[in-house]
């Protein structure tokens, strides 16, 4: 389709589609098409005109479907290495609801990071980078890890509406050796007063269910190190996030803490829920983030006047004209006649119409 025999083909791409072209229909969300990215994300997509990173040679160009973990059809797909002096930070479409809910309790859209997370190869080459500075850019992340070796994909997880960084990222190397070296070299380094944690990304789905905790009533002076001290006793903390006031930057007394195993999360709940921490004045509320999300959704539904499916509907009310007729009639009737009338009309409540 894209060979030299086709007059409309790109003769400089070695028979592959033009770089960044997704041959599979995706509703306009093709890789490398910044205009098709969700609002607030287009500025994070690198274009071929970027000068800080060299454009891949014709021998290494691939369509988006050919990259590992990106929904390729047939075979093992192409590779994004052999890029000479540089690579490009590919931003795949947004992660699926299930994947992102597992990661931060949010639902941000639909797309394809689940493939990358669930790819069996990802456990050996796909890394998660925690505790990134809030102002760190995708370019800086790429430059930091590209020094180790060729990269398939790298991306900082952000709120797609605001561009706000969640403080962690995924970096997928092309070789296991480079991913191992990245952990050994970059884990624990300090970047703008933030100590990075680099480790292998775990598969998504059931294996990380019930590991994310929602914590409230924390001291308003809580720090990352203090949160580690409080919760680190009960297991390996994969990710933590202290929520802060947007204006002052001070902690709001709320945090998310994700453990490596659900048993560790349950142990932390048993040990810390309703316990006053050192420096605090209120007992902590520690529960699963999923439970908090369900309670929040139920509260929102009640505020909107939406009745949950498991709540029975209210009993039927009498028509307005019958209620008005009863209101006029009962005034001239005795109590006995009112009771007799009401008994013959079980849906009427006399108190409502007095």
From Swiss-Prot:
The keyword Acyltransferase belongs to this UniProt entry's keyword annotation: no
Cross-referenced InterPro entries: Euk_RNA-bind_prot (IPR050502), Hud_Sxl_RNA (IPR002343), Nucleotide-bd_a/b_plait_sf (IPR012677), RBD_domain_sf (IPR035979), RRM_dom (IPR000504), Sxl (IPR006546)
Gene: Sxl
Positions of the UniProt region annotated as Disordered: 1-21
Organism, scientific name: Drosophila melanogaster
Domain RRM: start-end pairs: 125-203, 211-291
Any one GO BP annotation for this protein: somatic sex determination
Compartments (UniProt record): Nucleus; Cytoplasm
GO MF entries: mRNA 3'-UTR binding; mRNA 5'-UTR binding; mRNA binding; mRNA regulatory element binding translation repressor activity; poly(A) binding; poly(U) RNA binding; poly-pyrimidine tract binding; pre-mRNA binding
UniProtKB keywords: Cytoplasm, Differentiation, Nucleus, Repeat, RNA-binding, Sexual differentiation, Transcription, Transcription regulation
One Pfam family here: RRM_1
Protein name according to UniProt: Protein sex-lethal
GO cellular component: cytoplasm; cytosol; nucleus; protein-containing complex; ribonucleoprotein complex
Tissue: Expressed in somatic tissues, but not in the pole cells, which are the precursors of the germline. Expressed in the anterior of the germarium.
Protein purpose: Sex determination switch protein, which controls sexual development and dosage compensation in females. Sxl protein is only active in females: it is inactive in males throughout development. Acts as a mRNA-binding protein, which specifically binds to a subset of pre-mRNAs and mRNAs and regulates their processing and/or translation. Binds nanos mRNA and is involved in bam-bgcn mediated repression of nanos mRNA translation.
Assembly and binders: Part of a complex containing fl(2)d, Sxl and vir. Part of a complex composed of at least mei-P26, bam, bgcn and Sxl; this complex is involved in translational repression of nanos mRNA. interacts with mei-p26. Interacts with nito. Interacts with Unr; cooperates with Unr to prevent translation of msl-2 transcripts. Interacts with how; promoting nuclear retention of msl-2 transcripts.
């Amino acid at each position: 389709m894209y060979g030299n025999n086709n007059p409309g083909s790109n003769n400089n791409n070695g028979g592959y589609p033009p770089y960044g072209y997704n041959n599979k229909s995706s509703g306009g969300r093709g890789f490398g098409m910044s205009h098709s990215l969700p609002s607030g994300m287009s500025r994070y997509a690198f274009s071929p005109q970027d000068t800080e990173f060299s454009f891949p040679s014709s021998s290494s160009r691939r369509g988006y479907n050919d990259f590992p973990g990106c929904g390729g059809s047939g075979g093992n797909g192409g590779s994004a290495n052999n890029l000479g002096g540089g690579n490009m930070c590919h931003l795949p479409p947004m992660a699926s609801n299930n994947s992102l809910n597992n990661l931060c309790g949010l639902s941000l859209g639909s797309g394809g990071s689940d493939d990358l997370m669930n790819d069996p190869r990802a456990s050996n080459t796909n890394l998660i980078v925690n505790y990134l500075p809030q102002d760190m850019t995708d370019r800086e992340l790429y430059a930091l890890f590209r020094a180790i070796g060729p990269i398939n994909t790298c991306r900082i997880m952000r709120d797609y509406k605001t561009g706000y960084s969640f403080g962690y990222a995924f970096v997928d190397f092309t070789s296991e050796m480079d991913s191992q070296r990245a952990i050994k070299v970059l884990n624990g380094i300090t970047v703008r007063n933030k100590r990075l944690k680099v480790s292998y990304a775990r598969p998504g789905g059931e294996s990380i269910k019930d590991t994310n905790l929602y914590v409230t009533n924390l001291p308003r002076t809580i720090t990352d190190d203090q949160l580690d001290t409080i919760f680190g006793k009960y297991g390996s903390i994969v990710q933590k996030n202290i929520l802060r006031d947007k204006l002052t930057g001070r902690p709001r007394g709320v945090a998310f803490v994700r453990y490596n195993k659900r048993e560790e999360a349950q142990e932390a709940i048993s040990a810390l829920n309703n316990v006053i921490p050192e420096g605090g004045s209120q007992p902590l509320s520690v529960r699963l983030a999923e439970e908090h999300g369900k309670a929040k959704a139920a509260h929102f539904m009640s505020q909107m006047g939406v009745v949950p499916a498991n709540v029975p509907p209210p009993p039927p009310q009498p028509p307005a004209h019958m209620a008005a007729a009863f209101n006029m009639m009962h005034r001239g009737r005795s109590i006995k006649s009112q009771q007799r009338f009401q008994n013959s009309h079980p849906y009427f409540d006399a108190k409502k119409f007095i």
